[in-house]
């Protein structure tokens, strides 16, 4: 039988057929030789309506407050001196120093971002020489603090300033470490200005509570669901994407004669059948607190649950009344725990989940013991598939990513396993920058069509081609001579992430496992789009809020204690060492630790964020 409930209708078949199958089947065996990059053209900028940009920025200023270019402390003299030297490099070669964590933004085996083909083209097109500075791998946080503490900083620093600088971005501006950009955007960043004209709500993410625009953001964007044509940078919408979620063995489903589970009852019945009919040792298996894993299970109960060591962003959600709530104290959390306790008690959930790591979970999957788990796509499934077939060419292994669990079929969850469109990191212009114009023009180039294609796709004719209006990889990427995975081969041509709009379609295509058979590629795409387009329709977690210095100390002290307690009690409730009859007492204890004050602080931060949008 064929399993039902497989959602593979993300978009018209044109999107899959033209782009994926076209690349898989008919990529050129001899890619076109890379032509000399065109000289930097101003057409993207001049095509914009200058008056509308001016009106937009004026309206933003009225909304966010007066521009703070003469902030208190050392920033006054620093910003002023910088502003007067914005054109100092006009008469000679233009050079910009750029600090960025290579390990988290490249993905290629290079010593400098400047070695990437996209950046070679950017330097040629813009006429700007970029001197990259990279912290040692794994030491970005420490070296960020050291660089910022010094008197001389690079012109551009790409990092999460709002959360990593004491006091946030406003404090960094007041201290003269970075400059506010609102007075420069119209002239020096017309591409980004135009993008925010089209998507004004996103401006709040890079605007401080005091009204300062403090950097060029890294955001996820996507061609509209169902679109028959790929969309350029200005038409793509901000997008809450996810490349992680629930996976189930469809070959096992066929063996037990059942469809892909949708509701909690469906999941229970399927896992029970896996155990009783197939003798699976671990019908469901996952790593404790695996990033976003719990939301795929908890969302149907109306709660957002904490993961990743109970960081401040997780566990909190925004309800239908636009109020902040904490999932682990809601009634739905009790239902979530009861469901997992039921699976645990009946041997349907691996009883060792508290101590499992990703390697041990994969080992059990490879042995055929697991029917459902949490996976990252597509590298996770692709690697598993290749390892299984290597040992057993006749293995029927087939798995697909599925929707979050729901209470009732046909209903839509409020919370989803998705990342917010804004990643939290920005390219900020530092107070040491002597040529603001050049630094901003460099970053703004990535917000125009030409620069954005380079950063996302690489070199046209070499790493990608346009086929029926869709970018698709050439054979140099898909079937490269070195035998590398497409994502690895592509890493030399594009920047993995950074202060520009990232194209979800590129991320989707680059993550496709082309070693799979044609039908399995179809499943691969279906899984990714189930998670990103179905699960990620809404992001109702906390946006890019910031806490005041006066709030941070009180909040951290209380929430750290709460996080530890919630984690301990969650494990006890799931394993049954603590009866769920004591759930109300547990909630009272959480509030006695200062939960209400934490909620009040987060609500005030959300209110300030919302005020930026209005």
Could you say what each language-model-derived stretch is?
Residues 169-171, 289-317, 338-505:
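Extracytoplasmic/periplasmic substrate-binding proteins
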Residues 450-571, 577:
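Conserved small-residue motifs centered on glycine
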Residues 4, 31-33, 39-45, 49-52, ...:
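Conserved N-terminal structural module of periplasmic/extracytoplasmic solute-binding proteins
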Residues 182-186, 210-212, 217-295, 318-364, ...:
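Helix-loop-helix "hinge/cap" segment bordering the ligand-binding cleft or interdomain interface
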């Amino acid at each position: 039988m064929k399993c039902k409930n497989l959602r593979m209708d993300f978009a018209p078949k044109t999107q899959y057929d033209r782009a994926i199958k076209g690349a898989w089947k008919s990529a050129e065996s001899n890619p076109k030789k890379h032509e000399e990059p065109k000289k930097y053209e101003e057409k993207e900028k001049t095509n914009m309506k200058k008056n509308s940009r001016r009106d937009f920025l004026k309206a933003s200023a009225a909304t966010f407050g007066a521009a703070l270019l003469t902030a208190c402390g050392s920033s006054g003299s620093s910003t002023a001196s910088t502003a007067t030297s914005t054109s100092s490099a006009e008469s000679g070669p233009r050079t910009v120093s750029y600090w960025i964590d290579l390990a988290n933004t490249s993905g290629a085996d290079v010593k400098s971002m400047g070695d990437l083909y996209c950046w070679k083209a950017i330097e040629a097109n813009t006429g700007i020489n970029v001197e990259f500075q990279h912290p040692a791998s794994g030491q970005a946080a420490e070296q960020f603090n050291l660089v910022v503490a010094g008197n001389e900083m690079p012109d551009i620093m790409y990092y999460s300033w709002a959360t990593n600088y004491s006091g946030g971005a406003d404090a960094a501006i007041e201290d003269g470490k970075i400059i506010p950009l609102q007075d420069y955007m119209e002239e020096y960043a017309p591409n980004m200005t135009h993008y925010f004209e089209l998507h004004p709500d996103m401006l709040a993410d890079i605007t401080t509570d005091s009204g300062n625009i403090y950097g060029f953001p890294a955001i996820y964007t996507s061609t509209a669901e169902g679109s028959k044509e790929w969309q350029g940078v200005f038409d793509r919408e901000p997008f809450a994407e996810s490349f992680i979620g629930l996976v189930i063995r469809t070959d096992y489903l066929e063996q037990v004669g059942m469809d892909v589970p949708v509701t909690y009852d469906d999941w229970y019945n399927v896992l029970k059948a896996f155990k009783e009919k197939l003798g699976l040792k671990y019908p469901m298996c996952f790593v404790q607190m695996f990033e976003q894993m719990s939301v795929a299970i908890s969302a149907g109960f109306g709660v957002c649950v904490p993961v990743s060591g109970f960081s401040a962003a997780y566990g909190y959600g925004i309800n239908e009344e636009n109020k902040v709530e904490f999932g682990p104290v809601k009634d739905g959390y009790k239902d979530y725990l009861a469901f997992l306790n039921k699976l645990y008690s009946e041997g349907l959930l691996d009883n060792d989940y508290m101590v499992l790591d990703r390697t041990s979970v994969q080992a059990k999957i490879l042995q055929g013991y697991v029917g459902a788990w949490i996976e990252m796509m597509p590298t996770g499934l692709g690697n598993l598939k290749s390892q299984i077939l290597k040992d057993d060419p006749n293995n029927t292994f087939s798995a697909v990513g599925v929707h979050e669990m729901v209470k009732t079929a046909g209903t839509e969850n409020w919370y989803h396993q998705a990342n917010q469109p804004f990643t939290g990191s920005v390219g900020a212009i530092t107070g040491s920058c002597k040529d603001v114009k050049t630094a901003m023009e460099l970053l703004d180039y990535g917000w125009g069509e030409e620069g954005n294609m380079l950063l996302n796709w690489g070199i046209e004719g070499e790493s990608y081609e346009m086929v029926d209006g869709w970018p698709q990889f050439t054979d140099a990427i898909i079937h490269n001579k070195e035998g590398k995975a497409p994502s690895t081969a592509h890493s030399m041509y594009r920047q993995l992430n950074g202060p520009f709009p990232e194209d979800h379609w590129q991320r989707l295509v680059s993550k496709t496992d082309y070693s799979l058979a044609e039908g399995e590629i179809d499943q691969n795409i279906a899984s990714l789009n189930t998670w990103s387009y179905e699960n990620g329709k809404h992001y109702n977690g906390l946006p890019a809020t910031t806490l005041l210095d006066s709030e941070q100390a009180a909040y951290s002290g209380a929430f750290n204690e709460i996080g530890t307690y919630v984690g301990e009690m969650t494990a006890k409730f799931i394993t049954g060492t603590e009866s769920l009859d004591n759930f109300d007492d547990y909630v009272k204890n959480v509030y006695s630790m200062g939960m209400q004050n934490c909620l009040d602080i987060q609500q005030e931060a959300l209110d300030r964020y919302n005020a930026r949008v209005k």
